[in-house]
Amino acid sequence: MQQYFILDGILKRVVSNPAGKEMILRFAAETEIDTSYAAWRLKTTIPYAIRAVTRVRTAELSMEEWVAFVERHPPVKSQFEFEVMKLMSEVMAHTITLHLLDAPGRVARFMRKHAPLVERVPKKELASYLNLSPETLSRLKRRGKIDLQ
């Protein structure tokens, strides 16, 4: 299990069903982290994969090294645990959004929450994150129902 510090590029956290259909849970870019900390603490397997969306440069620590570091630095540990809770809340909010909002609403929420990523995330990945086909995303844009600017 790893602790990732993103220096350049974009990562995604994904889950896949047995047929290989992928659901993107979140994107993370420069200055952000991705982590398997919760699974490590709970002594469970990681229920998701962390993959590159774009060319990525990261700094990584094993979970053992990272936990040893934060144990020696209580303010860092406190901030880190807060960040982990925010990440988990973000994933929950995204999952709820997929169920409660229509396609234009999901796009609008992404634009509001992640505007800097719109031009950087490939449209195929964005469509997948929003639980849309790339064709539907393109059609919504063409018909003026969404604005990806």
Residue spans of the language-model regions?
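Cyclic-nucleotide recognition modules
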Residues: 24-82
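Phosphate-/nucleic-acid-contacting segments
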Residues: 101-149
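ATP/adenylate-binding site constellation spanning eukaryotic-like Ser/Thr protein kinases
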Residues: 8, 30, 55, 63, ...
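Glycine- and acidic-residue-biased ligand/ion/polar-headgroup-sensing regions
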Residues: 1-12, 30-31
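Cytochrome P450 core scaffold surrounding the K-helix E-X-X-R motif
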Residues: 14-20
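Short, Lys/Arg-enriched N-terminal segment that forms or immediately precedes the first helix
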Residues: 86-97
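Short Pro-Cys-Gly-centered "Cys-loop" motif that presents a nucleophilic cysteine in a tight turn
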Residues: 82-83, 90, 107
